[in-house]
């Protein structure tokens, strides 16, 4: 699965830990380049992980994998992300013929919820 994450996602260090029907769990070791000037994980990195976790969950929501693109996303930053690792858990809320609603949550290495997001994705075929 990790070889299918694409070059950007591999570049930033994302790894798929578990993928099931309509679910995805990603992990990423926090590196210095993921941090903002305050020393916490940059919001763009958080948004990337929300998008990828929700997107992979949407890809595997049905009997066969389907290609998706993100139509819209909404992130809620609840607490600064610090520590050594980010855990992302994505799940499908509803998958239709053309669109999918997914939700993803980010946790720090202490298991604290730090960020949550909703994604609307469009199926390409």
Specify the residue positions occupied by each region the protein language model found:
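Terminal targeting signals and extreme-terminal segments of soluble enzymes
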Residues: 1-125
């Amino acid at each position: 699965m990790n070889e299918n994450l694409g070059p950007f996602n591999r570049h930033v260090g994302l790894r798929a830990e578990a993928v099931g029907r309509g679910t995805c769990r990603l992990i990423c070791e926090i590196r210095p380049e993921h941090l903002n000037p305050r020393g916490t994980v940059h919001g763009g990195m958080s948004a990337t992980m929300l998008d990828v976790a929700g997107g992979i969950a949407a890809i595997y929501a049905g009997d066969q994998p389907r290609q998706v693109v993100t139509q819209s996303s909404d992130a809620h930053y609840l607490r600064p992300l610090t520590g050594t690792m980010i855990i992302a858990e994505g799940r499908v809320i509803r998958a239709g013929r053309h669109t999918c609603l997914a939700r993803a949550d980010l946790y720090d290495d202490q298991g604290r919820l730090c960020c949550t997001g909703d994604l609307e994705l469009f199926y390409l075929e």
